[in-house]
């Protein structure tokens, strides 16, 4: 009897959807190696492998059979995805065209030899970034350069603006996946895309105000409440939007955020917020570790860079990697909490993830432990351990959806004060 490798759902699934992977038709107790490979849009290969032993019936199910070693060990049904590593160091898995799936090739090899034995079975599976019926609408309106993702159907949907960080360009994968869960999501570029500024220093908050107005008047966006989600520099921009463009922004998710304005000064009308500086001489040899380089935003004169988040009207959800080495996200979340409470506001929701680094992505993305920083142009240590971060990404993804479902319900949120 020939071995068979089954993957469910069969043939295709959404990237954030778990898979059921099983092998049948092996000899009792047969040692095998499972291997996965994915090629990104620039041709880089990502790979993972794990050693297994079939049960007495010649079967193994990744949901019930622990890996004996390899890229991961233990019971990890999705390890063949999140444990993938690039062939080239510091390469990050990024989805550049969400209309085309990633194709994952899975193989079963005989034995536990490092170079692999005879191939016993093979399967190919497509991982899509747009659920059936999700619509992708390019937006080139006024100065706004973005893509709006709409769920299936003609109704109105809770609206979210999605910002990535200093990576620049237009990142659509998180927005496209969230649209599959019932949200109208605007993936917003703000520099290094088409005719937008090449440099982050030329971006003004009025640009984000224009994007907010666009969402509010869209016939398929359920007003009057809009949510924001941002990571890294995108997160402190979300904080600034919530603080200075506060009308109608009623729910903000901040992934490894700084409570101060970072990298470049912020301009809005007559407002000027300086950037929080850093001291690169504090870096040790080897990979650049930014965690201890940043100035303390509570000290003079750095406090001028603090974002007055207490002016925001809606609640916050802070998702914090405790091993973030780009900056002290855990410290900044505590500062935010103290500042809000000092102004009589409710405590924000803060979720701390141990052994989790800076780049918290949707589920099953391989955590980029170290990558080349798009602004600095150098290899930067992001922090995190793959197993722990894979769990954090799965938990964070559910919390993001729950948070937005709760607060983007078309009603004005109750204003709570503890004064």
Curated annotation (Swiss-Prot):
Q: State the species of origin.
A: Mus musculus
**Catalytic activity entry:** pristanoyl-CoA + H2O = 2,6,10,14-tetramethylpentadecanoate + CoA + H(+); phytanoyl-CoA + H2O = 3,7,11,15-tetramethylhexadecanoate + CoA + H(+)
Motif Peroxisome targeting signal: chain residues: 417-419
The identity of this protein, by name, is Acyl-coenzyme A thioesterase 6
Which tissues is this chain's protein expressed in?
Highly expressed in white adipose tissue. Detected at lower levels in kidney, liver, brown adipose tissue and brain.
* Induction of its expression: Up-regulated in liver upon treatment with peroxisome proliferator.
Name the family the entry cites.
Answer: Belongs to the C/M/P thioester hydrolase family.
What is the recorded function of this protein according to its Swiss-Prot or TrEMBL entry?
Catalyzes the hydrolysis of acyl-CoAs into free fatty acids and coenzyme A (CoASH), regulating their respective intracellular levels. Catalyzes the hydrolysis of phytanoyl-CoA and pristanoyl-CoA, two methyl-branched fatty acids derived from phytol, that enter the body via the diet.
Which pathway or pathways does this protein act in? Lipid metabolism; fatty acid metabolism
Intrachain S-S bonds: none
């Amino acid at each position: 009897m020939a071995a068979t490798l089954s993957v469910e759902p069969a043939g295709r699934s959404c990237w954030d959807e778990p898979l059921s992977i099983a092998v049948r038709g092996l000899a009792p107790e047969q040692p095998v190696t499972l291997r996965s490979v994915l090629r990104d849009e620039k041709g880089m290969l990502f790979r993972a492998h794990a050693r297994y032993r079939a049960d007495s019936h010649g079967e193994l199910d990744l949901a019930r059979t622990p890996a004996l070693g390899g890229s991961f060990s233990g019971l990890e049904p999705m390890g063949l995805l999140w444990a993938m590593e690039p062939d080239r160091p510091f390469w990050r898995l990024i989805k550049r065209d969400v209309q085309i799936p990633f194709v994952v090739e899975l193989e079963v090899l005989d034995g536990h030899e490092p170079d692999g034995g005879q191939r016993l079975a093979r399967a190919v599976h497509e991982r899509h970034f747009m659920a059936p019926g999700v619509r992708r609408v390019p937006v080139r309106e006024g100065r706004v350069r973005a893509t709006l993702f709409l769920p299936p159907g003609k109704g109105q949907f809770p609206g979210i603006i999605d910002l990535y960080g200093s990576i620049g360009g237009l990142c659509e994968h998180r927005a496209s996946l969230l649209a599959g869960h019932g949200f109208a999501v605007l993936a917003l570029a703000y520099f290094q895309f088409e005719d937008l500024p090449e440099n982050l220093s030329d971006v003004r908050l009025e640009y984000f105000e224009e994007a907010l107005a666009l969402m509010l008047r869209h016939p398929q966006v359920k007003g009057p409440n809009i949510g924001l989600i941002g990571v890294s520099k995108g997160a402190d921009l979300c904080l600034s939007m919530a603080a200075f463009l506060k009308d109608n922004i009623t729910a903000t998710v901040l992934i490894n955020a700084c409570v101060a304005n970072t990298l470049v000064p912020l301009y809005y009308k007559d407002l000027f917020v300086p950037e929080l500086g850093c001291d690169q001489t504090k870096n040790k040899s080897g990979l650049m570790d930014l965690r201890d380089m940043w100035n303390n935003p509570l000290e003079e004169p750095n406090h001028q860079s603090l974002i007055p988040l207490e002016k925001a009207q809606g609640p916050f959800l802070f998702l914090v990697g405790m091993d973030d080495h780009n900056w002290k996200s855990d410290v900044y979340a505590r500062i935010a909490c103290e500042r809000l409470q000092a102004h009589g506001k409710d405590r924000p929701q803060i979720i701390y993830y141990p052994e989790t680094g800076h780049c918290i992505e949707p589920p099953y993305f391989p955590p980029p432990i170290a990558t080349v920083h798009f602004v600095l142009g150098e290899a930067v240590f992001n922090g995190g351990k793959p197993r722990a971060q894979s769990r954090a990404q799965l938990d964070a993804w559910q919390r993001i959806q729950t948070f937005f479902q709760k607060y983007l319900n078309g009603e004005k949120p109750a204003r709570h004060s503890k004064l």
